[in-house]
Amino acid sequence: MSKGTPSLGKRHNKSHVLCNRCGKRSFHVQKKTCASCGYPAAKLRSHNWATKAKRRRTTGTGRMAYLKHVSRRFKNGFQTGVAKPQSA
């Protein structure tokens, strides 16, 4: 049996399964870490050499249900809904 490409066809076991955090098939079974997002580390895995990957998962690629309204509220001084007292 050869060492290189022919022996790669003999592999059957999965080394990566689905990750609980990012959902990709990048969670290494033996290492117990995700190759994509770094789970179970507290902070998300990101590197400067992977600019495209950063662009895919950065702020603004999702719904931004809260953040998209912040700039407008900042412009108005974060009003609370209570009218200002009238000064005579």
From Swiss-Prot:
A biological process term (GO) from this entry: translation
Keywords of this entry: Metal-binding, Ribonucleoprotein, Ribosomal protein, RNA-binding, rRNA-binding, Zinc, Zinc-finger
Cofactor(s), by name: Zn(2+)
Top-level taxon of the source organism: Eukaryota
Binding site for Zn(2+): C19, C22, C34, C37
Start-end of C4-type zinc fingers: 19-37
Pfam family, one: Ribosomal_L37e
Signal peptide: none
GO cellular component, one term: cytosolic large ribosomal subunit
GO molecular function annotation: rRNA binding; structural constituent of ribosome; zinc ion binding
Cofactor binding remark: Binds 1 zinc ion per subunit.
Coiled coil region boundaries: none
Family assignment from sequence similarity: Belongs to the eukaryotic ribosomal protein eL37 family.
Functional description taken from the UniProt entry: Binds to the 23S rRNA.
Protein name: Large ribosomal subunit protein eL37
Organism: Debaryomyces hansenii (strain ATCC 36239 / CBS 767 / BCRC 21394 / JCM 1990 / NBRC 0083 / IGC 2968) (Yeast)
